[in-house]
UniProtKB/Swiss-Prot annotation:
It comes from the Eukaryota. Interacts with PURA. Interacts with YES1, SRC, FYN. Upon tyrosine phosphorylation, interacts with PIK3R1. This is Constitutive coactivator of PPAR-gamma-like protein 1. Gene3D superfamilies: 5'-nuclease (3.40.50.1010). It comes from Bos taurus (Bovine).
């Protein structure tokens, strides 16, 4: 992209504009110009854009990032950085990108494609050479941004997160808070007249921690070399190509500037593909063109000249050209108002601007060449209203007319990070959560959301309406309503066109022209240089359920302060998230993609965030009281943008929120803000249930230390993957051994550790594990932070390099556990206990892979490309979702993740008995959630209709391993459905062993006995005989390994389970049917293993780590 290439152009072609500086000298207030000195007590205040600086805050491109991250090394570097800034009178404020930024989605799509290719290069390099990849392939370890954010909070460095438009909020925050400079690396900042602009890529801390250096960009020198007045930078930026008007739309214009005689003219169209000129050539040509513009205020004339070669969508391009000029004009001039969506916007939540009054920056000690007065680019005049840009791009959002009086709170509400570094529960932190009476300025108004939408598609009005529905609860249709020119009137910078070419041009022929390509209108084939450029396609989804205003206030407050996982605010207000690429081998089928592996976790988290369980329970109770049938609940759909094997990031996947079946999770307001002991326990239970780890051992510190809860939950979740086995015995031991190793807290020793040959599978396991940690942080924050954030940080339990060394020992040398623990018998005993806790109630008998289910049928509302792709073995469906499995014979290949909405008739038909089902086991749900063909059980079965046996069939051969007999299978048609008892935290799985594969079905303890019982009996004697004959069978089947069930959807055994990979000594604890937190409130409140909820309990290894890091830095 042209604008993004401008930063590299400065580095390469304007060396005089890049000046090295030492930040400590600037902070000391040395002589500047005529001898003025800065007051010594005034710190040098620098704003750091973390989005451009993550690799520097991580500690640089040292080679071991590929192993999953060396988090204690990063912690030591940040400790040294914080100490150097404190000693050098420098105040850092780190601004993280917490915005969804739909307006820049096409940039994200391109970036994900590049990172996906880089990931494959990394895997290939490690497989072929066994050495770390070069630093030019640096791919941030999973969860790196969140780990850096938590570490900065640990060292009392102020942080914040953007909420709508990251660049605008950073620029506005820098100006309105009196920061002396901005540390970043982005062309948008270079073109926005920042007073002092420093390079984030050049930021370096010396080894002794006394010198912090970087480079400063002198933009007036850049303007001098381009021979371009800075007042014309907005037009220059708009014509280079940007997120509003991409350079693909300007390709014809750029080629026309070069002319047919240019040496590169022959590259204009090659192999029927769109070819863009080199970026440096385009920058020089566009600078010459802008320099020669006679009247910069006549934007219509400029646009007419620029797009004279355009063959389609010219009106749309002109509109976006004007909007781009308005965007850069607004960010180039010093703001007399606060930036949008962040600082002093009329806030419906009763929250003040986050910043104090504007304080002009003081003079800095910078080279003499940079002291020249930098011209301020005034706003380009336009025929519009005063104070607006040439296009009505109004940052103040006049549509929001709420009063601003009475909205100021004290600054301490935004400075509530505990100084002691200890955990403070969410419900105890000060947040503006008190709702005001209706009619007051604090009253929530739905006008907040329509103006805040930045959807990149032409259905921007639906996105705004759907967001507004969170507050008002009004029902809106899926059809497009309202004027298409309304987003322009609001000045929404993110309004983009769809991939199929639809646009939001104002007036007249925009619909006919924009949609002509997709309705089959006879038109000439357009030139490649003028085809639609949106390389992503958005999808309209149903409106989200309303969310309590108190919850939204807390979510927005904590999101801005950087105290909450950013996905939470995105889900609550937008209903969509973006999932970054991780290191995965797409050529291998051994390991599933991280996006698919942890999708069930996200589905349950979505259900927690929207309080699905309680809302549906209330509705069912109300219908029961009124003697009505329970209503058909509309699915809650979340859009997930991700890129993995077989899935392009250009289209989102529609994922349905799920609720826990066996217990009713409280609503989000109570989960976050409740102060009772029961509420604390429900938070922990909700978190464990999301991670499928609701077992008593997880809360027993004798088995699982408190600071290792997240580690064990993630490993247990990975072990339960129903497809191909993810973790082998030695790999699980390697994870546990490195977490208990004393070397984990010695980053200097780890730096000296030599890895002879990197294991490709090891680096992929590390990436999968860190993806699980990422999702655990998401689930923990969504459930009210039951696990203290200090115990969630990965430096407490993981180091990628140490894991590689342990894995090489365990897998290649077949090292015994005692040797894997460096001869420490006590450490080996702890590993044994943790392994038993993780594997409690799980069964790992070898089975053949099931046949993939048929693909789901396409719906009229959703294109086929949005549905999940097949990848490896098929996991069971989770929860009571309403997926495509409602159609007989079809099932979702990765569980019930795709919503239906149009196939409700099929679900009703299934529930009323039009499809056969296993008798006694909630037949409607079984048939809905399990599609495909059932394999023949080993003991045969019989078919009954209305209680009469009409057929028998023989069984297949018994599976290998000497498994016990499976109960006789009975397929019943026409019998009454039986209910299902509560008491287990998640859905069990029945596995049928043999050559026929396996079938995933829902069941419970006595299902083997109940399945054999006919739905009708002819006489009392038959009933007596049946009960007598079944009593013994039920006892044996309940104790059999194939029939006994455990929690979390896996088969359990009362006898010791078989060893993983045939290793000896891996005994398991017997399965338990109760959850970690009993339903009885008395038992729940007196549980002695709940010290994870106490701030004064648990292991003190975190304190040891902090002391070690600080001592090492002193």
């Amino acid at each position: 992209m042209g604008v993004q290439g401008f930063q590299d152009y400065i580095e390469k072609h304007c060396p005089s504009a890049v000046v090295p500086v030492e930040l400590q000298k600037l902070a000391r207030g040395s002589l500047v110009g005529g001898g003025r000195q800065r007051p010594p007590h005034t710190p040098l205040r620098l704003l750091v854009d973390a989005d451009n600086c993550l690799h520097r805050l991580y500690g640089g491109f040292y080679t071991d990032w590929v192993s999953g991250g060396q988090w204690n090394h990063m912690l030591g570097y940040l400790a040294a950085l914080a100490k150097a800034c404190f000693g050098g009178n420098i105040e850092l404020f780190v601004f993280f990108n917490g915005a969804l930024e739909k307006a820049r989605l096409h940039e994200w799509v391109k970036r994900q494609g590049n990172e996906r290719q880089t990931a494959q290069q990394i895997v290939s390099h490690v497989q072929n050479k066994g050495t770390p990849p070069p630093k030019v392939w640096f791919l941030p370890p999973v969860c790196m941004a969140h780990c850096i954010r938590l570490a900065l909070i640990r060292f009392h460095v102020k942080v914040a997160q953007s909420i709508e438009d990251h660049h605008q909020e950073v620029i506005g925050f820098c100006r309105e808070n009196g920061f002396h400079g901005l540390v970043a690396y982005d062309s948008d900042y270079a073109l926005c007249n920042i007073p002092y602009y420093f390079s984030a890529h050049a930021l370096k801390l010396s080894r002794n921690g006394k010198s912090l250096t970087t480079s400063q960009y002198l933009m007036h020198e850049v303007a001098k070399q381009l021979d371009l007045n800075p007042n014309r930078f907005p037009i220059f930026a708009a014509l280079l190509g940007n997120h509003i008007l991409p350079d693909e739309d300007l390709a014809s214009f750029h080629w026309s500037l070069l002319g047919p005689e240019h040496p590169l003219a022959s590259l204009k169209v090659r192999a029927h593909q769109l070819v863009l000129p080199p970026c440096d050539v385009v920058i020089k040509a566009v600078a010459d063109y802008v320099r020669n513009i006679q009247d910069t205020s006549d934007l219509d004339a400029i646009a007419k000249d620029v797009f004279q070669h355009s063959q389609s969508r010219t009106d749309d391009k002109v509109i976006r050209f004007k909007r781009a000029i308005g965007y850069y004009s607004a960010t180039s001039k010093p703001m007399a108002f606060h930036p949008p969506h962040y600082l002093a916007r009329p806030n419906p939540f009763g929250m003040p601007g986050i910043v104090p009054p504007y304080v002009p920056p003081q003079m800095l000690n910078i080279p003499q060449t940079s002291l020249q007065a930098k011209p301020v680019a005034p706003q380009v005049p336009s025929p519009g209203a005063p104070g607006q840009g040439p296009h009505p791009y109004n940052l103040a959002e006049p549509a929001l007319t709420l009063e601003t009086s009475g909205k100021n709170l004290t600054e301490q509400n935004y400075s509530n990070i505990p100084h002691e570094g200890k955990h403070t529960p969410l419900y105890e932190r000060s947040s503006p959560i008190n709702p005001a009476p209706s009619g007051s300025p604090n009253h929530v108004d739905s006008a907040y959301f329509p103006g805040s939408s930045t959807s990149s598609s032409s259905d921007n009005d639906e996105g705004s309406g759907g967001a507004a529905n969170h507050i008002s609860g009004n029902k809106i249709g899926w059809e497009k309503t309202g004027s298409h020119s309304e987003p322009q009137a609001r000045g929404d910078p993110g309004d983009q066109t769809k991939a199929e070419g639809s646009s939001t041009a104002s007036s007249g022929s925009q619909l006919a022209e924009g949609k002509g390509n997709q309705i089959g209108t006879v038109q000439p084939i357009p030139c490649l240089l003028s085809m639609p450029t949106r390389n992503h396609m958005d999808i309209t989804t149903p409106p989200l359920p309303p969310v309590a205003p108190e919850v939204l206030r807390v979510a927005e407050h904590r999101h801005k302060k950087g105290l909450m996982y950013p996905y939470i605010f995105h889900v609550l207000t937008k209903g969509e998230i973006k999932i970054a690429v991780s290191i995965e081998d797409e050529a291998s089928k051994d390991l599933p993609p991280a996006a698919l592996l942890y999708r069930p976790v996200r589905q349950y988290v979505y259900g927690v965030l929207f309080s699905l369980a309680e809302s549906r329970k209330k509705t069912e109770r109300l219908a029961f009281r009124k003697n009505r049938l329970p209503p058909e609940f509309s699915p809650v759909i979340i859009k997930e943008w991700a890129a993995y094997k077989g899935k392009s990031p250009q289209t989102p996947e529609l994922v349905e929120a799920l609720a826990f079946r066996e217990w009713t999770c409280p609503n989000l307001k109570r989960l976050w803000l409740g102060k009772a002991v029961e509420d604390k326990n429900r938070r922990m239970r909700a978190f464990l249930a999301c991670m499928r780890s609701d077992t008593p051992a997880m809360l027993n510190p004798a088995s699982v230390p408190t600071h290792l809860t997240v580690l064990c939950c993630v490993l247990r979740y990975m072990v339960q993957w129903p497809g191909a086995r993810i973790l082998r015995r030695q790999e699980l031991d390697a994870f546990l051994a490195q977490a208990l190793s004393p070397k984990l807290y010695e980053p200097d020793q780890l730096q000296e550790l030599k890895i002879e040959n990197l294991d490709p599978r090891g680096i992929q396991l590390s990436a999968l594990f860190m993806s699980g940690v990422d999702m655990a942080l998401f689930a923990n924050d969504a459930c009210g932070q039951p696990v203290p954030w200090e115990h969630c940080c990965p430096w407490m339990y993981f180091d990628g390099k140490l894991f590689q060394s342990k894995l090489l020992k365990a897998s290649r040398e077949k090292t015994p556990l005692i040797d894997l623990c460096d001869g420490q018998a006590e450490q080996a005993a702890k590993v044994e206990k943790m392994r038993q806790s993780i594997l409690e109630g799980l069964n790992f008998s070898r089975q053949s892979h099931p046949l993939p289910f048929p693909p789901p049928a396409a719906l009229p509302f959703y294109p086929t490309s949005v549905y999940p792709r097949h990848f490896g073995p098929v996991p069971p469906a989770q929860g009571r979702g309403r997926g495509f499995a409602g159609v007989c014979g079809f099932g979702s290949p990765y569980g019930e993740t795709v919503a239906t909405g149009a196939y409700r008739a099929f679900r009703v038909a299934t529930a009323t008995g039009h499809c056969g089902a296993f008798s006694g086991s909630d037949s409607s749900r079984t048939s809905k959630s399990q599609g495909g063909i059932q394999p023949i059980p080993s003991q045969g079965g019989k078919l009954e209709i209305a209680g009469t046996v009409v057929g028998h069939w023989a069984g297949s051969r018994r599976g290998r391993g000497g498994r016990g007999p499976f109960p006789l299978q009975v397929v019943s048609v026409g019998g009454p459905a039986r209910g299902r008892p509560r008491g287990v935290i998640s859905t069990p799985v029945i596995r049928t062993f043999g050559r026929g594969g396996r079938y995933y079905g829902r069941g419970y303890k006595n299902q083997g006995a109940i399945q054999g019982k006919p739905p009708y009996a002819a006489s009392a004697e038959e009933v007596a005989k049946e009960l007598k004959s079944r009593s013994g069978e039920s006892k044996s089947s309940a104790m059999s390994s194939d029939g006994s069930l455990a929690e979390n959807g896996v088969v359990a055994e009362e006898k010791p389970a078989p060893q993983m990979n045939g290793s000896a000594g891996d005994t398991r604890a017997p399965s338990h049917s109760e959850s970690a937190l009993n339903n009885d409130s008395k038992t729940c409140n007196t549980n002695p293993h709940l010290n994870a909820l106490s701030t004064d309990s648990g292991c003190r290894r975190a304190d040891a780590l902090e002391a070690a890091v600080l001592k090492k830095e002193e």
